[in-house]
């Protein structure tokens, strides 16, 4: 039975996270993994090339050695193990899951924010502070979107939660109440 990508990513990320956390190498490993993810994102098709049949085994091993260059033993071992077990196509998913675990431990959160107009620095800082307080986070990173259709206010997506404080949704609520 073949495991899906999410299950594979969860297992590898959990094992690596627990290992480096116990060895006090969490921050260093996190930084290395973010850099490794960037390599995969900058070289679209790298995972497919390493998993596919276009390259010889020697060519693949050479690429793996290049990826391991300068990496800690933890990251180098992860790369080797994922390659050896034919799961290199899961590498970015593994790193994403590791980052989720890291963020949870460090009380960091990522929020998708939609506003009708561009937020200025003060508004952005205030929103970050409010979200940090509401969700108990030490650090908040915003991904900002501007959508004039919401008319005003803000829509925030965090994890699987949506906080809709937009003017357009308020108008829709009032309209529904009046139609009754």
Curated annotation (Swiss-Prot):
Annotated PANTHER family: ATP SYNTHASE DELTA CHAIN
Give UniProt keywords alphabetically.
ATP synthesis, Cell membrane, CF(1), Hydrogen ion transport, Ion transport, Membrane, Transport
Q: In UniProt terms, what function does this protein have? A: F(1)F(0) ATP synthase produces ATP from ADP in the presence of a proton or sodium gradient. F-type ATPases consist of two structural domains, F(1) containing the extramembraneous catalytic core and F(0) containing the membrane proton channel, linked together by a central stalk and a peripheral stalk. During catalysis, ATP synthesis in the catalytic domain of F(1) is coupled via a rotary mechanism of the central stalk subunits to proton translocation.
Write down the membrane topology. Peripheral membrane protein
NCBIfam families for this protein = ATP_synt_delta (TIGR01145)
Q: How does it assemble?
A: F-type ATPases have 2 components, F(1) - the catalytic core - and F(0) - the membrane proton channel. F(1) has five subunits: alpha(3), beta(3), gamma(1), delta(1), epsilon(1). F(0) has three main subunits: a(1), b(2) and c(10-14). The alpha and beta chains form an alternating ring which encloses part of the gamma chain. F(1) is attached to F(0) by a central stalk formed by the gamma and epsilon chains, while a peripheral stalk is formed by the delta and b chains.
Q: Name one Pfam family in it.
A: OSCP
Q: What's a Gene Ontology MF term here?
A: proton-transporting ATP synthase activity, rotational mechanism
Superkingdom is Bacteria
Where in or outside the cell is it found?
Cell membrane
User: What is the name attached to this protein's record?
Assistant: ATP synthase subunit delta
Q: What family is reported?
A: Belongs to the ATPase delta chain family.
Against InterPro entries, the record matches this protein to: ATP_synth_OSCP/delta_N_sf, ATPase_OSCP/dsu
Annotated Gene Ontology cellular components are:
plasma membrane; proton-transporting ATP synthase complex
